[in-house]
Amino acid sequence: MSQSPIELKGSSFTLSVVHLYNSEPEVIRQALQEKVEQAPAFLKNAPVVINVATLNGDANWKELQQAVTAAGLRVVGISGCRDERQKRAIARAGLPLLNEGKGQKMATPEPAPAPAPVVDPNAPAKTRIISTPVRSGQQIYARNSDLIVTSSVSAGAELIADGNIHVYGMMRGRALAGASGDTQCQIFCTHLGAELVSIAGQYWLSDQIPSDFVGQAVRLSLLDNALTIQPLN
């Protein structure tokens, strides 16, 4: 008997979730484009889930999808929809509806970031230091610098740095070093349990991290444009 050409299996993936607080497509496009420009190596063409839990009233779902795509992201589904009329409208637009776990909490919106200062490319890079726990739903971004976290990083939290990332605590969230494309950046963890690790756009999900290194002190870097991992001595 010949083998079937396909096989369906269940799996899980770590995806970024875009929480919408406005239904105007152009407003959404501009806001997302700013985010993508901050970390192009990781976000450009990245798959995302759109959470619409806070949107009230009608929206043009096709135009919203086009706005997200125009910003450089790819919509894989819609979450947070509880209104049946809204669900039907989303389905008519050809967008998949995703069910969330019962215990899942919606991340609180981040305050609008202050305008970025002009960076002198010849100035020495500074280091951003976080000495408190990074909670689920939080995102920390170290622009043009290294990021050091001296506490734990919860699952669902995200660390992004244009430079290196150091975590001196339990690392359960996502760590994205070299976000602006610097392939020389590295990630250092004293206790690795990450959902995702990435350097200059090359990434591993949790199930791709070699099991011998989970829970250990490690250093991640790029070799021939591929992630490598070794003990941190």
Curated annotation (Swiss-Prot):
Coiled-coil portions: none
Taxonomic superkingdom: Bacteria
Keywords: Cell cycle, Cell division, Septation
Tagged with keyword DNA-binding: no
Disordered: region residues: 104-124
Gene Ontology biological-process annotations: cell morphogenesis; division septum assembly; regulation of cell division; regulation of cell septum assembly
Annotated Gene3D superfamilies: 2.160.20.70, 3.30.70.260
InterPro entries on file: CAP/MinC_C, MinC, MinC_C_sf, MinC_N, Septum_form_inhib_MinC_C
Pfam families recorded: MinC_C, MinC_N
Family listed: Belongs to the MinC family.
Quaternary structure (record): Interacts with MinD and FtsZ.
Biological role stated in the UniProt entry: Cell division inhibitor that blocks the formation of polar Z ring septums. Rapidly oscillates between the poles of the cell to destabilize FtsZ filaments that have formed before they mature into polar Z rings. Prevents FtsZ polymerization.
Record protein name field: Probable septum site-determining protein MinC
